[in-house]
Amino acid sequence: RQSSHCRNGTERCAEAVENARLDSDLIINFQGDAPLTPPWFVENLIHAMGEDDKSSMATPVVRLDRVTYGHFLQDRKKGLVGGTTAVFGVDKYALYFSKEVIPFVDMEKLSAESDIPVFHHVGVYAYRPDALSSYVEWPIGELERLEGLEQLRFLENNQLVKCVSVSAQGRVFWELNNPDDVDRIEKVIEASL
């Protein structure tokens, strides 16, 4: 049973690990708002953390295709806050996460065959146990408070967050962030039956 003082999924995960007295090299936090997450996203996280001992945590990102990019922009124009985007450097360490669609893309400067340089952050996390236990000791920072994104607490405390680029391999991927998302997700699930 979780206590009521946990403010987000990462704090709940840390509390569960502490209560269960788990001794593990890696903790995976699979959150309920991403029911379409395929298993290889988690496998890729585990592999990436095994190869990079500098990262405090890792999270998957999916490059948006033009259709999904359009959905993200339409949602924002409607005032809906949903899909989180991630920006990262050449080393794949996160620079920022936002509920805005970042980076801005001037489509007139992007050739028709170019990939959109926007990545959807998937709400699944792999943590090193020491980083997870430190997380609950850090205060909520200004960026986390403003964006409402728990992973920003790691960045605000100078922790390396690895963005692991994953492919949906032809599957439709969408998270549950707004009431309209329920219908989208249910249609994907129905089509897969």
Which role fits each region the language model picked out?
Residues 2-4, 32, 88, 99, ...:
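Active-site donor-binding loop signature of nucleotide-sugar glycosyltransferases
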Residues 1-47:
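Short phosphate-binding loop-to-helix
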Residues 22, 97, 111-193:
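Conserved alpha/beta core of the MobA/IspD/sugar-nucleotide pyrophosphorylase nucleotidyltransferase superfamily
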Residues 5-10, 65-66, 171:
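A short acidic, often aromatic-flanked loop/helix-cap motif at beta-alpha or helix-coil junctions
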Residues 38-138:
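Conserved core of the sugar-phosphate nucleotidyltransferase
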Residues 4, 24, 37, 52-59, ...:
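Structured catalytic cores of enzymes that bind and process phosphorylated ligands/cofactors
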Residues 2-8, 14, 77-83, 103, ...:
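One-carbon transfer enzymes
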Residues 14-18, 72-77, 180:
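Short, surface-exposed amphipathic charged segments that create phosphate/polyanion-binding patches used
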